[in-house]
Amino acid sequence: MKDKCVLTEYTISSGLPRRLVLGLVSDLHESDPKDVLEILRKISPDLILVAGDTFERHGGTKDTQRGSDEGSVERMLRHLLMKLDDIFEVVFGKRDFNPEYSRRFLMEAGKIAPVFLSPGNHEWYFLPKDLDIMKESGTKLLDNRDCKVYIKDMTIRIGGLSSVPDIRW
């Protein structure tokens, strides 16, 4: 986020019988969510959609989990990318992130509106404590999944497409 929060408003004709206000948040990268939360409280969205990169999860030999349906080949490739990321940190230096900011964002956002999160290219995996905070905050993880949501007497479908980890960033 680099201390920059941008609000862009769009009005889209959806054909739904009622108006929905959606808050779309992306690329927090474990930065202070204060400004984002302030905007979300101000616009009072019906749903909050998180389009990836809330957490910085790459590199290392951590106790990790990408998703319950991860196959052995995907797991092997993810672990290979994690090792490459470790090498990049040795060569270029380790960056400072604060995972507490991501946890605070999800907890506070969940008090504003239902939250749906799709992983981004910086979220190669989730730690068990990340999944715990999603559960505790009521955040619905959409990792190549969709779900039906009943809101304002309407049923809508929300889906999340996961990013393939990208080491070029």
List the predicted regions and their residue ranges.
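Acidic, histidine-bearing metal-coordination/catalytic regions of metal-dependent phosphoesterases
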Residues: 1-34, 41, 62, 75
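A short acidic, often aromatic-flanked loop/helix-cap motif at beta-alpha or helix-coil junctions
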Residues: 17-18, 147-150, 166
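Structural motif
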Residues: 20-22, 46-47, 156-157
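Short, flexible loop segments at the rims of nucleotide/cofactor-binding pockets, characterized by
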Residues: 24-31, 92-96, 164-165
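Short hydrophobic segments within beta-strands
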Residues: 25, 50-51, 118, 159-161
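Short, glycine/serine-rich, charged loops/turns that create anion-binding
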Residues: 29, 55, 122-123, 163-165
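Core catalytic region of metal-dependent phosphoesterases/phosphodiesterases
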Residues: 34-151
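Binuclear metal-dependent hydrolase catalytic cores centered on His/Asp/Glu-rich metal-binding motifs
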Residues: 132, 136-139, 151-169
